[in-house]
């Protein structure tokens, strides 16, 4: 049925691995539809893009300080992101309901958290389900920056400016998680690993421009981001 629906869209939408759909699942779908991208697991590419975004946050927002980070979700994206950050000596807290995934995180050197509102982390990196950024989060959060790979993090778009009015810098998910699409399309665009990594690194450059705007105006209208980057 899923393949039938994708075929009905006739190429307007291309499906790929994501939450609830494994790479093996999508390869089965590819037997019934050509409108899929099943060449790679996008998770590591998404994670590398987030890493470049976070590195830009550390360099340009925190002036090089290696701030603590809370990663929510320790699947393909969260675990790969943690590996990059741990290599730099970053202290990482992990919010994960799956006990096996949490144990994996702890073995790597991450720290558990009982509540996302009770850690020393300055940066919140949501890499699980969407809708996590709601009024309760804004009210209780002490984070300075939100920068993660989960899709549709805002419960509603009108919370975008509200987050910034509370002094938090939110880097939009559709910019931060672009690495997944970059990885999925590398074969279609005939990019080698070096070209792909350069494309991923550009995510960090985009994040720098957002940080510059935030420092200048202490807010970032959603329209500014969409008009400039979409």
Question: Can you describe what each PLM-predicted range is?
Answer:
Residues 41-121, 125:
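Glycine-rich phosphate/diphosphate-binding loop of Rossmann-like nucleotide-binding domains
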Residues 3, 7, 27, 47-55, ...:
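Predominant activation on well-ordered alpha-helical scaffold segments within soluble catalytic domains
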Residues 12-17, 63-68, 214-226:
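Flexible, glycine/charged-enriched surface loops at secondary-structure junctions
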Residues 1-63:
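Glycine/serine-rich phosphate-binding loop and adjoining beta1-alpha1 elements at the start
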Residues 66, 99-175:
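Rossmann-like adenosine-cofactor binding region
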Residues 10-14, 34-37, 68, 90-93, ...:
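Structural motif
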Residues 144-228:
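Adenosine-phosphate binding glycine-rich loop
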Residues 7, 86, 106, 164, ...:
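Anion (oxyanion) recognition and catalysis
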